[in-house]
Design a protein with these regions (language model features):
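Phosphate/pyrophosphate-binding loops at sites that engage ATP/ADP/AMP, CoA/4′-phosphopantetheine
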Residues: 43-58, 201-218
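Phosphate-binding/catalytic loop of phosphoryl-transfer enzymes
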Residues: 74, 82-162, 191-206, 288
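Short glycine-rich phosphate-binding loop at a beta-alpha junction
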Residues: 54-65, 83-85, 213-227
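Conserved phosphate-binding/catalytic loops in two-lobed NTP-binding clefts
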Residues: 81-93, 237-253
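Short glycine-aspartate micro-motif
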Residues: 2-6, 59-61, 123-127, 221-223
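Glycine-rich phosphate-binding/hydrolytic loop that grips phosphoryl groups
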Residues: 241-289
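Short glycine-rich, Thr/Ser-proximal phosphate-binding strand/loop in the N-terminal lobe
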Residues: 2-45, 141-167, 173, 184
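A mobile "lid/hinge" subdomain adjacent to the ATP/sugar-phosphate binding pocket shared
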Residues: 160-192, 220-221, 226-232
Length: 289
């Protein structure tokens, strides 16, 4: 089976791909100092929570924003003798219209591929992670840029670690904006403030994308993803068309299917992709069998 593996700065997210289904989707804390052995133990342990194991993995589709762990994952795949595809700007099946494509995180590009394939274009993906990213896809299916803000948990951590008397608090939406104690005041500033930031930036981006693409703002697909996309405060955001916490994993599955020529959905093939040729995606590491 294919293992979709997303290595972020905060979390490692993975899932086994079976047809159109992401199975055994799990998250764990990223440990940048991991060895190939430690990464394999982590992945195997997560898969075993759902009755699977590394023995079931025949290929790995990887998006990583941690360069050291990209190398660790490559070494792990080579030792196990499984194919590895590393997503990056050089093997995306869509035009990338930004000044320096090499600076765009692999997860952001994978999200763009997934949203275009699964939800249509033009589109905006909002990914709530260590950073919150806003990524835009044009009407003709090109990645055209976006925005990056500190993630909500990063802001909360900064408040607690950089001040003498502010405590660490739970990310919970307060009943009102005016807090009557330290905890409720912090919850108001962090949760309600972050929601306002997200809404304001999303509205600006949607308006600008609609203008450049000559479409009505209401015709732009807005999809939330990331672990916090299912948080109560995020689920209440207006103007959102879908919440898809596994969007990145689905994008990795799509990229693998395009690279291998396998059907993405029943009756579909890589040749049906409305972007660059599937052959532009290559397996960058394939251990000898």
């Amino acid at each position: 089976m294919l293992l979709a593996l997303d290595i972020g700065n905060t979390n490692v997210t993975l899932g086994l791909v079976h047809g159109e289904t992401i199975m055994a989707a799990r998250r764990a804390t990223t440990k940048a100092a991991s060895t190939p052995d430690e990464l394999e133990v982590l992945i195997d342990g997560l898969l075993r929570l759902d009755g699977a194991s590394m023995a079931d993995v025949t290929g790995i589709s990887l998006a990583s924003v941690v360069p050291t762990l990209t190398g660790v994952a490559t070494a792990m795949a080579e030792r196990r003798g499984v194919q590895l595809m590393v997503a990056g700007p050089g093997n995306m099946p869509m035009p990338i219209r930004v000044q320096r494509s090499v600076e765009v995180g692999a997860d952001r590009l994978v999200n763009a591929v997934a949203v275009a394939r699964l939800y249509g274009t033009p589109a905006i993906v909002v990914d709530f992670g260590t950073a919150t990213t806003f990524d835009c896809v044009s009407r003709d299916g090109a990645y055209v840029g976006g925005a990056i803000t500190p993630g909500i948990e990063l802001g909360l951590e900064a408040l607690a670690s950089r001040t003498a008397r502010l405590p660490r608090i739970e990310l919970q939406e307060p009943p009102k904006a005016i807090g009557t104690d330290t905890v409720s005041a912090m919850q108001s500033g962090v949760v309600l403030g972050y929601r306002a930031l997200t809404l304001g930036l999303l509205e600006s981006i949607r308006t600008e994308l609609a203008r450049t693409e000559k479409v009505d703002p209401g015709n732009i697909q807005v999809v939330l993803t990331g672990g916090l996309s299912v948080a109560p405060w995020a689920r209440k955001l207006p103007g959102v068309d879908a919440i898809d916490p596994e969007l990145t994993l689905k994008g990795l599955a799509i990229l693998w299917a395009l690279a291998s020529g396998e059907p993405i959905v029943p009756g579909d093939t890589a040749a049906g992709w409305t972007g660059s040729a599937a052959g532009s995606i290559h397996i960058i590491s394939e251990a000898a069998k």
